Amino acid sequence: AYYSPSQDKIHLPSPGSFTSEYAFNATALHELSHATGHPSRLDRDMGGFFGSSQYAYEELVAEMCSCFMGVNLDQTASPDHINNHKAYVQSWIKAIRDKPETLIRAIKDAQSAAAFMDWKAGLITDKEYSQTMNSTMEIATRSRDRDAR
């Protein structure tokens, strides 16, 4: 499964290709998270190549967003799936150790992506979406201000 920014298209195998419905949904949410970064949506920097720090950052955002959104699914993640999420996020831990503020920024971007998907799905109102986006922007600003000191 992958998201193509140039085509603005998600390529997702059929549900039968996955080990479970949860695995399919988690993967779909991960790829949808990437799609929120498109310039016509939240406009995240998605220009990184595989192995670059920008690529790692975007993967961290998408995986965290997938986990945030997965809470809303009426499904229980198996221990294997939880370990898969954990391993995926741990694979990007070096970037976080090198620049701890990266984690704060990634959480903010993951929350923004989750709010965007909730808003587009009609799960939250325009007002709730605006409030969420404003609060995540305030957190990002405070984090940047602290880092500048």
Regions found by a protein language model. Give the residues of each.
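Long, well-structured alpha-helical subdomains associated
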Residues: 67-140
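Glycine- and acidic
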Residues: 13-16, 45-51, 92-96
